Regions:
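Proline- and Ser/Thr-rich low-complexity, intrinsically disordered segments
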Residues: 1-175
Length: 175
């Protein structure tokens, strides 16, 4: 100043905490991301921290501006989080389909190349073989059987509905 005095001060410039984001799968169907192969009942969310709060979100695909994304199928979803100062952080998450539920039905009884031992008999059987989906499975046969093998069958057509742990179903029949 005019008297020759000098004043000194120091200023510390501090960075805000680094903005981070972590997307995660929030749907859980017995360990699967979506209930059935091809279903769109999955969900995901993103957690943001650091930066300057007042976050906005943008998901692709989908264009959602929420921190959660619902009614989605298998695939990779990317989210960009923007804080109040315009800083960004991106993360992604991948939802996977469970194996497709499949069913085959076959005659399992064999009496010298015949399905039933005698004309008019009821000692035939049929087996439902299931793969994919999410175990355990339930069986509902048209004759009332509720196991993988329907027994005591007479000649005719029998149908079965198999349901997995997530409610996915497949139908089959045998004559």
């Amino acid at each position: 100043d005019a008297l020759g005095c000098i004043a000194t001060t120091s200023v510390t410039v501090v960075n805000p905490p680094q903005l981070t984001s972590a997307a995660s799968i929030t749907s859980d169907y017995n360990g699967q991301d979506v209930s059935c192969f091809g279903s769109t009942d999955g969900s995901t969310s993103v957690a943001a921290s650091g930066g300057t709060p007042g976050y906005t979100y943008f998901w692709t695909p989908g264009g959602s501006s929420n921190s959660t994304l619902s009614t989605i199928g298998a695939g990779t979803y990317n989210v960009t989080v923007t804080d109040l100062n315009g800083c960004t952080s991106s993360s992604s998450v991948t939802l996977v389909n469970p194996p497709s539920l499949s069913l085959s039905v076959a005659i399992s009884s064999n009496y010298n190349s015949q399905n039933i031992s005698c004309f008019g008999g009821n000692d035939g059987s049929a087996t439902a073989t299931v793969s994919g989906g999410t175990a355990p499975y339930t069986y509902s046969w048209s004759n009332g059987a509720t196991t993988q093998i329907a027994s005591n069958l007479s000649a005719g057509t029998y149908s079965v509905v198999v349901t997995d742990a997530n409610g996915c179903t497949r139908n089959g029949s045998i004559t």
